[in-house]
Amino acid sequence: MAKDYSRTQRIGDQMQRELSFLIQREIKDPRLGMITVTAVEVARDLSHAKVFITVMGKEDSADEIERNLEILHEAAGFLRMQLGKSMKLRSVPQLHFSYDASVRRGVELSALIERAVAEDRLHTGKGEE
């Protein structure tokens, strides 16, 4: 019987929860925006973890995203140390932060769909009169 939920997935999910907490509570950099950890992909050998983040609010410009990624890269050592303490792993993966644009794309697509539906209602309303 194959495992439906592998160890790397479980570790990735736990890392996502722990990193969300640590970024919100432990990083005291005032330049850091409202960061949401959307996913963590852990390599099979647990040597690397790709952490996907979004930046909420007005910080949606490319410069703000880059600045937030730089801050997180600078704090990666501290975050690894804290993860090691809280998760009790023998070796904590190297953290690589990436911006997850899927949330922004989803919002843009929703707006396009809503606009198309509104225009369709407007056109069908004129056709019936």
Curated annotation (Swiss-Prot):
One of its GO terms (cellular component) is cytosol. Monomer. Binds 30S ribosomal subunits, but not 50S ribosomal subunits or 70S ribosomes. The keyword Cytoplasm applies. GO terms for molecular function: ribosomal small subunit binding. Belongs to the RbfA family. It comes from Azotobacter vinelandii (strain DJ / ATCC BAA-1303). It holds the Pfam family RBFA. One of several proteins that assist in the late maturation steps of the functional core of the 30S ribosomal subunit. Associates with free 30S ribosomal subunits (but not with 30S subunits that are part of 70S ribosomes or polysomes). Required for efficient processing of 16S rRNA. May interact with the 5'-terminal helix region of 16S rRNA. InterPro entries: KH_dom-like_a/b, RbfA, RbfA_dom_sf, Ribosome-bd_factorA_CS. NCBIfam families: rbfA (TIGR00082). Its main location: cytoplasm. It is found in: Cytoplasm. The keyword Cytoplasm applies. GO terms for biological process: maturation of SSU-rRNA. Keywords: Cytoplasm, Ribosome biogenesis. This is Ribosome-binding factor A. The gene is rbfA.
